[in-house]
């Protein structure tokens, strides 16, 4: 595990402890049970595939640890509507505040503005956060294999599925496959950013494809335009999580539209 990931996870543990002190586990479960009905994240992706279209998970991201502030003019409802109008399948919204300048309010605002399903993009280290995600209105959660042990992955997935949510499992390399082998989610993402060097290469996804036969594979990071999309589709990958390319565009709707 890298130093930056360790730092993020240490801070996240402190954050979750404070959140539990403010809203206890019983209360967050009750809020999750009362949340708006789940929108099918995996269903929306499969709907695009049935139309022979790339399924784009479009990300709402203000900043990142490596790039700093990405989009100063940051209005989640407007961004969400641009994504929906352009044909995105789903949204991904950063809720981590210390490192990505995210917020649960951004997730709520984005979901209220559109009919698309929404992923909570964060560092999930406690099942409390899965209930929390549903309470905020999220339809899917990200589980990062590099950040979790086998037992945590299996438990958090079970909680998400009990709540009707989709799980996007994120891998970085083959070493993480073994601890994920009992997971049942159909949605397996590969982050093309090398955790050691932070270099981005689509080869990360390609190298894992043989091991992910039968899964709906999401390629994450490093997709910069239609040429990348068409290249990955030629290799059998039809689902794309894209953030920074869109966030830096003057006209987000037009930028997304270029992929179709």
From Swiss-Prot:
<dbReference type="GO" id="GO:0004640">
    <property type="term" value="F:phosphoribosylanthranilate isomerase activity"/>
</dbReference>
<dbReference type="InterPro" id="IPR011060">
    <property type="entry name" value="RibuloseP-bd_barrel"/>
</dbReference>
<comment type="similarity">
    <text>Belongs to the TrpC family.</text>
</comment>
<dbReference type="Pfam" id="PF00218">
    <property type="entry name" value="IGPS"/>
</dbReference>
<protein>
    <recommendedName>
        <fullName>Indole-3-glycerol phosphate synthase</fullName>
        <ecNumber>4.1.1.48</ecNumber>
    </recommendedName>
</protein>
<dbReference type="GO" id="GO:0000162">
    <property type="term" value="P:L-tryptophan biosynthetic process"/>
</dbReference>
<comment type="pathway">
    <text>Amino-acid biosynthesis; L-tryptophan biosynthesis; L-tryptophan from chorismate: step 4/5.</text>
</comment>
<keyword id="KW-0210">Decarboxylase</keyword>
<dbReference type="InterPro" id="IPR013785">
    <property type="entry name" value="Aldolase_TIM"/>
</dbReference>
<keyword id="KW-0028">Amino-acid biosynthesis</keyword>
<dbReference type="InterPro" id="IPR001468">
    <property type="entry name" value="Indole-3-GlycerolPSynthase_CS"/>
</dbReference>
<keyword id="KW-0822">Tryptophan biosynthesis</keyword>
<keyword id="KW-0456">Lyase</keyword>
<keyword id="KW-0057">Aromatic amino acid biosynthesis</keyword>
<dbReference type="InterPro" id="IPR045186">
    <property type="entry name" value="Indole-3-glycerol_P_synth"/>
</dbReference>
<dbReference type="GO" id="GO:0004425">
    <property type="term" value="F:indole-3-glycerol-phosphate synthase activity"/>
</dbReference>
<dbReference type="InterPro" id="IPR013798">
    <property type="entry name" value="Indole-3-glycerol_P_synth_dom"/>
</dbReference>
């Amino acid at each position: 595990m890298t130093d930056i990931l360790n730092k993020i996870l240490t801070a996240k543990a402190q954050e979750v402890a404070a959140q539990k002190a403010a809203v206890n586990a019983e209360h967050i479960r009750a809020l999750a049970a009362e949340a708006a009905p789940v929108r099918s994240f995996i269903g929306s992706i499969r709907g695009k595939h049935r139309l022979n279209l790339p399924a784009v998970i479009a990300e709402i991201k203000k900043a990142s640890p490596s790039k700093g502030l990405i989009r100063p003019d940051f209005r989640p409802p407007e961004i969400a509507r641009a994504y929906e109008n352009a044909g995105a399948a789903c949204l991904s919204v950063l809720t981590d505040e210390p490192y990505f300048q995210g917020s649960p309010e951004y997730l709520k605002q984005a979901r209220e503005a559109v009919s698309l399903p929404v992923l909570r993009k964060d560092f999930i280290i406690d099942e409390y956060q899965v209930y929390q995600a549903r309470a905020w209105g999220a339809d899917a959660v990200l589980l990062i294999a590099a950040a979790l042990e086998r037992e945590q992955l299996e438990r958090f997935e079970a909680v998400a599925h009990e709540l009707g949510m989709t799980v996007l499992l994120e891998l970085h390399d083959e070493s993480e496959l073994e601890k994920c082998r009992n997971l049942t989610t159909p949605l397996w993402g590969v982050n093309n950013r090398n955790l050691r060097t932070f270099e981005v290469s689509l080869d990360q996804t390609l190298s894992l494809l043989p091991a992910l036969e039968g899964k709906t594979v999401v390629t994450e990071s490093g997709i910069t335009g239609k040429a990348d999309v068409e290249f990955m589709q030629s290799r059998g990958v039809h689902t794309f999580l894209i953030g920074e390319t869109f966030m830096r565009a003057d006209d987000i709707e037009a930028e997304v539209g270029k992929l179709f």
